[in-house]
Amino acid sequence: MKKPVIVPFGTMRKGKVVKLNDQRLTCQPKKPYAEVLFFGDLHLGHPTCLLEKAKENLDYCLNNRIHVLLMGDLIECGITGSVGDSVYTQKLNPQEQLEDTVELLSPLAQAGLILGLHGGNHEDRVFKTTGINVAKMMAGTLGVPYLHQACWNIFRVGKQSYTVYSMHGASGSRFIYTKLKAATDISHYFRADVIAHAHVHDVAAHTIERQSINKRMKKIVYEKHYVVLTGHYLGYQLSYAQMKGMPPSHVGSPKLQFFSDRHDIHSST
């Protein structure tokens, strides 16, 4: 990947909106695969944000040359009129959240490891009330592709290419099986090697096996597809989830390995 140019925060630079995010990934040293961490729902500024755990994962990616796809809701962005009480309880105001998030992600962007940045419904709060797209501003400042709230991706690893449909999502599912069902339903309409779905604050990877016919070889073949829930970084105690009686969920981000010597994907959650 070409390394982006980081501009000082406050310098206006138009974020580049892409419809097809075509990226060449670098394999791990002496390994036949490239790795991608799907990182989202940080909610920086929220009183229960587990920022240190997020920093650990991002530092690990930086030190080990792991690519990162940003899945939205990176900032809490509590504003007047938004759902919930975070406009009163957030630890930083939205401007500080925006600046701290750019500072947090700049080393990865400078290293050319950020594949793209999605907006989420929390960033979208500002757009709905002012027309200012803070997610696009973050992408422009970092010099990475802005993927809106959903985007097709092609990840090229060696001679292999993988299709990934990534999105922030909008499901109100409460339990892991209903969260996975909501993401799996999307796979019925988007034929991709990976469906990556954020927003539901859980980490999971589900494999779908499908049959199809290879017309050239005249035989039945099996295809493996992944549905991935891309995690979060919010503690449970005194959280919205606890207040609503939702079960505690796994904190963190899933990591996928995309192989270069065969068409295969492994997951680590």
Whereabouts are the PLM-identified features?
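Short, flexible loop/turn elements at secondary-structure junctions
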Residues: 40-46, 157, 168-171, 231
